[in-house]
């Protein structure tokens, strides 16, 4: 019985804290005029502008807020999907095949520490200012995270599981697809989640 009461109290306090912040914000900006509306518009003004832009209000470029959101999602998902499609198989291949790891990992380790934002000048030089340069920057962020976690997940596969599979006559590909990848899925999905950030 104590848990539901505590839960309700927590929800009430959460709502009250948000309402308090909004009230103080409105008080400071619109009622007492302590802060210029140019510096910090009131919550009512922000809400009115949001609704206006959402419902097709006139923007300088003629697009609605939903059109801007759709354009941003197209760029973000484009880079993310390509980064994951290349990064996950690369990480798995590097972790599973020693010869491929010796070839690819040094090259990957060169670009791995470079932050995604550092690629901006190169992307602009290579791809211009437009859709593809933005996708390229997001691609690198997603690619690095997906590759690292896929690699780590396969490397953490229990050797005992691989020995058991080998004892039962599993081929190299069967061990990869039936043992290593299922074991690595939590790490791979963590990489996919981090790649979204």
Question: Where are the model-predicted features located?
Answer:
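Hydrophobic alpha-helical transmembrane segments in multi-pass membrane proteins
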Residues: 71, 75-83, 117-121, 182, ...
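Periplasmic/extracellular loop-to-transmembrane helix junction in inner-membrane transport proteins
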Residues: 31-81
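Transmembrane-helix boundary motif in ABC transporter permease subunits
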Residues: 78-108
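Hydrophobic alpha-helical elements at and bordering transmembrane segments
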Residues: 65-69, 73, 103-104, 110, ...
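Transmembrane alpha-helical segments of polytopic membrane transport and secretion proteins
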Residues: 1-19
């Amino acid at each position: 019985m104590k848990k539901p009461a505590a839960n309700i109290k927590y929800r009430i306090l959460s709502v009250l804290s948000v309402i308090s912040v909004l009230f103080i914000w409105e008080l400071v900006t619109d009622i007492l005029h302590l802060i210029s509306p140019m510096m910090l518009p009131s919550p009512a003004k922000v809400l009115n502008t949001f609704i206006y832009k959402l419902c097709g209000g006139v923007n300088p470029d003629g697009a609605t807020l939903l059109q801007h959101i759709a354009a941003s999602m197209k760029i973000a998902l484009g880079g993310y999907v390509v980064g994951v499609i290349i990064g996950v198989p690369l990480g798995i291949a590097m972790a599973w095949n020693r010869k491929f790891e010796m070839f690819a990992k040094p090259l990957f380790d060169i670009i791995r520490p470079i932050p995604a934002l550092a690629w901006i000048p190169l992307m602009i030089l290579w791809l211009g200012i437009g859709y593809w340069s933005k996708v390229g920057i997001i691609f690198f962020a997603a690619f690095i995270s997906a590759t690292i976690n896929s690699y780590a997940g396969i490397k953490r596969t229990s050797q005992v599981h691989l020995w058991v599979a080998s004892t039962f006559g599993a081929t190299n590909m069967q061990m990869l697809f039936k043992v290593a990848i299922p074991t690595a899925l939590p790490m791979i999905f963590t990489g996919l989640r981090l790649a979204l950030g």
